[in-house]
């Protein structure tokens, strides 16, 4: 049985957020992000992260699902405190940057306001 450790919804899409997605990255930040950062982010209504992010968990973005393949050293802390992480759709087994989560699967083409973000332990 899957155990949901995080659940939220996209509330706003920054002007340049789609550009990052085209480059294989999705940047999340909670509501209230500084304006200069929010322009590049998919802003979400932040929830409590019930457990640290780990390799093997599944993240759902809208209707798509992805396996987490690497977790940066500060990704869980940043996500818990700031609602901020960068997701890279490259399936790397080593995190490039401390705040990055790498996921396996086809790069998401679009995410909409109201789409759900969910992270589960399988």
Which positions does each model-derived feature cover?
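N-terminal, charge-rich interaction modules
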Residues: 1-24
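Helix-rich interaction surfaces within compact, conserved domain-sized segments
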Residues: 27, 91-122
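Short, structured beta-strand/loop micro-motifs enriched in basic residues and often containing a Trp
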Residues: 37-48, 94-103
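Short, well-ordered loop/turn sites that connect or cap secondary structure elements
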Residues: 51-53, 59-60, 111
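Short coil-to-beta-strand transition motifs
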Residues: 57-67
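Short, conserved beta-turn/loop elements at beta-strand boundaries and strand-helix junctions
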Residues: 64-65, 71-77
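Short, solvent-exposed secondary-structure boundary/capping segments
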Residues: 75-86
């Amino acid at each position: 049985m899957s155990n949901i450790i995080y659940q939220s919804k996209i509330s706003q899409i920054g002007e340049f957020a789609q550009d990052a997605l085209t480059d294989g990255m999705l940047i999340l930040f909670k509501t209230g992000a500084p304006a200069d950062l929010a322009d590049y982010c998919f802003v979400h209504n932040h929830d409590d992260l019930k457990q640290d992010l780990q390799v093997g968990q599944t993240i759902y973005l809208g209707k798509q699902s992805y396996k987490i393949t690497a977790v940066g050293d500060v990704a869980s802390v940043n996500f818990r405190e700031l609602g901020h992480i960068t997701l890279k759709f490259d399936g790397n087994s080593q995190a490039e940057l401390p705040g990055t989560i790498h996921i396996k699967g086809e790069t998401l083409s679009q995410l909409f306001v109201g789409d759900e973000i969910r992270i589960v332990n399988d």
